[in-house]
Amino acid sequence: MKKKICVITRHAIVNYGSFLQTYATQEIFNRYGYDTTILDYVRYDEEYRNVTELLLKKSNKWNKNFLTRLIYRIVQWPDHYICGRAFEKKRNKYLNLSERITDINKEKSKIPNADIYCTGSDQVWGEIGGDDIDPAYFLDFVANKKAKKVAFSASFGKSNYSEDRICKFSDLLKNYDYIT
């Protein structure tokens, strides 16, 4: 029987790089004989339906008054929505996705059972959207003590972090069995 591997990555970002790295990661594990599932964990701030409003809130230029906000929505929303839908269709067609999870702490029952849990690949460990790091990408949700925790080509996205942040990363990385 094939070993099961569950991969968490930032697969729902609306760009080709995100989609292609997820697909490549899935396929490499499949070729090595694993039954691969991509954990369909999509944070609220990475859901394409929410991008226009989230970017608007952060914009000093467009968030001045009702009229500028309306113009921004009229111009940006169709692009975000149409591109988001197109990428969603590709993800659903080519990726073996788990059930959708938007809050990993509240929806643990949706996390697939696996022999191996994997973070990667690409920039999954750094801050997301200016926020703090997301512990889910360090596999903090894995309850199965027998399961291996691995990182496959995972990165932070930048190299300059405060000493406090480096200590936090160091503690989180100790939970892994293997890091490539």
PLM regions: where:
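A short beta-strand/loop micro-motif in the catalytic core of glycosyltransferases
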Residues: 177-180
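Extreme N-terminal starter segment of soluble prokaryotic enzymes
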Residues: 2-6
